[in-house]
Every structure is written in structure tokens, then in C-alpha cells.
Amino acid sequence: MIPGEYHVASEPIDYNGGYEAISLEVKNVGDRAAQVGSHYHFYEANEAGLQFDREKARGKRLDIPAGTAIRFEPGETKTVQLIDFGGKRRIFGFNNKVNGFLD
């Protein structure tokens, strides 16, 4: 290996493989932009500004690479893909709507 050299996979990385995604339309009705990160419990995201079917979003997060986010500008409507939280499916913090097991 040469210093600074990268060895990358020849195939695309399936970063959220094995999870079934749902589509959800989201509208920002607020007067400021809202940004939601990759591992935020979408059900609890910005109740004042973002309008969407919250029950469909319960237990789900954005289907985007870790460490990234989606930004919703005021008045903007976007369709996002959501996937289930994995692991033991326990949610703590965020806006304190669950604080325990999802199932």
C-alpha cells in the first residue's frame, strides 16, 4: 500500500440492506428550514413545522447514509423513504414521545 492510497470496494455499498422502506410525503409548513438526521426517530421530528402521517413514521428513521440529513425548506414538500429502527427497537430521548420499547 502506498501512503494515502485508498482501497475501495468495486461493488456499491448497500448501506441499509435488509430493511423494507416506506414512502412518506412531508411538508414544511413552518417559516424556517428544518433538518432531520439519518438516525432521528422521524415520528418525533419537528411537530410544529413538519406535516406528515406520524403514525406511519413511528419506529422509523430516514433511509439515507449514516451521518447525513435531509433539509426541508419553508413551504417545501418532499417524499422521503423511511426504514425501521433495528436492534432491540428501544427509543430514548428525542422529544420523549416513546422512551422505551417500540414493540
UniProtKB/Swiss-Prot annotation:
<dbReference type="GO" id="GO:0035550">
    <property type="term" value="C:urease complex"/>
</dbReference>
<comment type="function">
    <text>Ureolysis may allow urea to be employed as a nitrogen source for growth and produces ammonia which may protect from killing at low pH.</text>
</comment>
<dbReference type="InterPro" id="IPR036461">
    <property type="entry name" value="Urease_betasu_sf"/>
</dbReference>
<keyword id="KW-0963">Cytoplasm</keyword>
<dbReference type="InterPro" id="IPR050069">
    <property type="entry name" value="Urease_subunit"/>
</dbReference>
<comment type="similarity">
    <text>Belongs to the urease beta subunit family.</text>
</comment>
<dbReference type="Pfam" id="PF00699">
    <property type="entry name" value="Urease_beta"/>
</dbReference>
<dbReference type="InterPro" id="IPR002019">
    <property type="entry name" value="Urease_beta-like"/>
</dbReference>
<keyword id="KW-0378">Hydrolase</keyword>
<comment type="pathway">
    <text>Nitrogen metabolism; urea degradation; CO(2) and NH(3) from urea (urease route): step 1/1.</text>
</comment>
<comment type="subunit">
    <text>Heterotrimer of UreA (gamma), UreB (beta) and UreC (alpha) subunits. Three heterotrimers associate to form the active enzyme.</text>
</comment>
<protein>
    <recommendedName>
        <fullName>Urease subunit beta</fullName>
        <ecNumber>3.5.1.5</ecNumber>
    </recommendedName>
</protein>
<dbReference type="GO" id="GO:0043419">
    <property type="term" value="P:urea catabolic process"/>
</dbReference>
<dbReference type="GO" id="GO:0009039">
    <property type="term" value="F:urease activity"/>
</dbReference>
